[in-house]
Amino acid sequence: LLRLLPAYEGHWDELRDASGALREPWREFFERLGDVGIARLEDHRASLAQQIRDNDISYNVYADKGVPRPWALDLLPFLISEAEWAHIERGVTQRAHLLNAIVADVYGPQTLLQRGQLPPALVFGHPGYLRPVKGYTPPGGQFLQVVAVDLARTPGGDWTVMAHRTEAPSGLGYALENRLIVSALFADPFRALRVSRLAPTYSQLIATLVQAAQATMRHDSEGADRSPHIALLTPGPFSETYFEHVFLARYLGVTLVEGKDLTVRDDKLYLKTLGGLERVHVVLRRLDDAFCDPVELRADSSIGVPGLLQVMRAGNVIVSNVPGSGFVESPALHGFLPGIAEVLLEEDLVLPSVATWWCVRQTAVGHAFARMDDAFIVPTWPVAARDAPPGVEQGRQRLAAWRERIEAMPDTFTIQQALRFSCTPRYEEGTIGRRPSVLRVYAIADASGGWHVMPGGFTRMAAERQATVSMQYGGSSVDTWVLSSQPTSTFTLLPSPIQPADLARKHRTVSSRAAENLFWAGRYGERAENNVRLLRLILGSLEGNDAEAMFPTLVELALYCGLVQSGDMSAPHSPQAFERALVANLSESTGTASIGQNLSAQARSNGEVRGRLSNDHWRMILAARNDFRDALQELMPAPGVGGAASPGEGNGIAGTNRNDRSNGSGNANGATNCCGERYDRLTLMDALEHLSVQLSAISGAQGDRMTRDEAWRLLFVGRHIERVSAMTSILRIVADHGQLATPAGFDLLLQLFDSTLTYRALYPGRFEVPALLDLLVIEPTNPRGVYGVYERLRKKLDEIAVAAGSTRHRPFAELMAPVASLPTLESLCTVDESKDYGNLMAVCDQIGTYAGAAAHEISARYFSHASTIASQVWS
């Protein structure tokens, strides 16, 4: 039924022995599978791909600019016999002991350095060695809780250690997801072969972290019975392995956090939530060492936690693994491990390392140079912006050039023997092919200082016609089965089926970061809607009969909303220059209040909480941004696309100056180059109409497709703040220019408030200011009526305060004047001696101030958790 493709020449064949017979594990596997199972392999492959799509398993590739691609998983598992695994287990356990002892010695007595077993230059020159950690000893002396060891099988069939991963070992989540998918497809062989289970390993990891956390809880006021709070610290959605972080946190039952979610207070670490600060006792980090703490490590890190190392040194948090453990990942260390093992463990290495020569050692490098046509040159430590060193396929001329570089900077280079990795079988549409593979095995520390090796691992397979085994270069993964002769445990951390009696309304913890991103997503979306509506109206009004009279009003509205920059309109201007400035300021590269920038910022904020959005909702958001970008490229040459603003970054309507600009790329001269004959107003109007429909769809999805928790309420609070601020400012500007009672001003307000149809239905053929103000200000059922939006804002704020359970702050309703106390319609229609609507303008200013102050108070109360500033803001 299957055609067997030949293995790579000179490589160990995992499937067949030298005589061509199937090796024992594979013989058993295919016997258990049977002819029927083999005939269904193609169906299984399709099912596997469907499960990956359904589960949205992805892997971000840097070369794709952070665009996630579907996870690459091969159908057939990688099989390891019980006897062979016992040897691997002993070797990996020994390595984990050894690496932990090296880290402890380097940050402690430094005996290895003093005795010359470990060159100081190799340690102190490595960016993974962190001086702020010197002298720190974690509880129990356990620096490493998770160690990953990459193994490859040589052509002779022996296992060799290729690399260690101690900084932030990846793959634990993917290994588990691989197991869940593949074991379900091959359920009968999985049971019959008694494949060892992975769940006890993850249970051991949690038990280890919980035990380590006890030392951080000794001074807790909550009591000794309280469970420690464990958080998995991720770089965020742009990490290549972000899916794994989400999946692993959910499986382990720990909180997934980013650096912005955490804060340090009084040498303790806290998670910022809407309900207040929650103590964090253990951080299982997925960040590289240098990015963990911008105060003491990389100052440019925006993904770390300021002050984290100080909390760690104070003994109030366990960080796993300890920052600074990355130096033992250096490939040059392999050459020194045999001697170090003899000193620290009084043992020989069970698993040998790949032959390695650090180029500083002259005796070794001479031997290595003689073999450079059969070796790889690798960096001794991570260095950015360096072209990749060549491997064996580069040719002698290329190698000679690298030899000169090595002689100039010997400490930065290490030479390793090139190994021909064993070839693992893979299913390829009716055939069994083989690819080079590397096995990653994980060791988990226990509370007594021992190690538990996960019976399985994360096998990676090279891409077609590739010798390098890497997921970044198009490789794939394989589920790893360790066979056993004994019955295996059925223990699992997966949740058991829920029974009706078990159901309860579970409260979902809302982090401050998630809430803040949704808050700003609402604000950016509302800004975009307001600006699109205003721009369509302005472009349609510039050639109308009232264009000249309305021109100053339109210019001020555009300046306020950020459609043009103040510098564009500082000189005497004409409608033509105004229009050119409007068109020149559309893209996201021209300023933080442009339509393009608001769309980009909306996508960025929603992307930070991608897990809360349905697929359709997320696609709408991306389509709105991308379609508008495409339309602008057709309309005029694009000056470049900038990045989206972060939450809170940019110019807010409420409480901030919308006209402040970071650059002048959207000046009038630039607009002249973009407009003229090439500018097609009809094309732009079509694009704006299309965008308006898309934004309405996004708004509908927000109201109909999202869980209505505190974070969702904050999204709509953000929209209400922007809406009431915009509506009051528009009313004030139109009234200030004396256009409130003119037909053009009347029509302008009805369109901007999206109330034309309602007004005509209520007051057909009549244009009277009292009727207008009643609809736009007083009427509570008008979705854009000022008083109605303001009252809904007050109620939403108090709903959030009640849901968050905070008693430290005054209710928002007490800080914002009730609608009943605001001016009546009769008062709003009063005209003073200067023919101004003074009361109307005053209440617009008052409500705008309340909205701006509410935005500041929300930030202090729920996002930054600073001391309340209400007493200052609301006075």
How would you describe each model-predicted region?
Residues 1-83, 87:
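N-terminal low-complexity, Ser/Thr- and acidic-residue-enriched intrinsically disordered segments
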Residues 2-24, 145-146, 153-160, 164-345, ...:
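ATP-binding N-terminal substructure of ATP-dependent carboxylate-amine bond-forming enzymes
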Residues 420-423, 428:
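FAD-binding core of flavoproteins
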Residues 85-106, 119, 125-130, 244, ...:
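Active-site nucleotide/adenylate-binding loops and adjacent lid/helix of ATP-dependent enzymes
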Residues 54-143, 154-156, 166-218, 226-230, ...:
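Alpha-helical transmembrane segments and their helix-helix packing motifs
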Residues 371-374, 384-396, 400-405, 424, ...:
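Polyanion-binding catalytic cores of nucleic-acid enzymes and NTP/SAM-utilizing transferases
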